[in-house]
Amino acid sequence: MAKKPIDPKIAAELSRLALMPDDEIDTSDAPEVTDWNRAIRGRFSTVSLDERGYDVRAIANWILDYLSEMRINASNMSLNKLIYFIFERGLVERHILYTPARVEAWNHGPVFREVYHAVKDNDDKPISDRISRYSVRDREMVEAREQFSADDMDFFKSVIDDYKDFTAAELRRISHRDDGPWDRVWKSAAPVNPGMVISIELILASAPERRDLDGRY
């Protein structure tokens, strides 16, 4: 049977996507790959989560906008930590999963790969630009934005207000607290997963419901 020729517009779009740099590829909805060989399984969570489905890059841009209003700068490291604290507290305190993006345990704490790569050229300098994503509808890179609910924005503000005066190093230390989610993944001797993913189940099992601003609980 003869193959049906590909529409020229679709072929051109596929060629464009094939040339897209790895840093611009959205992997936020990629399934978590877990190798349980010699690993200790985490406690099974029976908590029902409300999934918002927000793009983590849009959350990052919202944080940058909010900090800018207060004339506060954010670096790559501090931005990733602030997103993580929203992610963690949303799960623990509200049973809300704000983004399907995976959080990973890196050397300097929890990191969202999409955000890190988008602003990595800033190194440790303040971030001035906003993060973009590829729009299938518009066929171009656009600024990552979401229509956040008023309630969610109020929650985001409450978390950022708790941590806005901390330095990046202090936020890193808080995220590294003993026996916390990052600590459990980073120090695990077993090959729990290749991507060092900090799973939702692990966060619910090891993160405290409330903690002091310095990370103690």
Residues covered by each model-derived region:
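Domain-edge interaction signal
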Residues: L49-Y217
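A detector of short terminal or domain-flanking linear segments
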Residues: A2-D50
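Generic N-terminal leader/processing signal
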Residues: M1-A2, L79
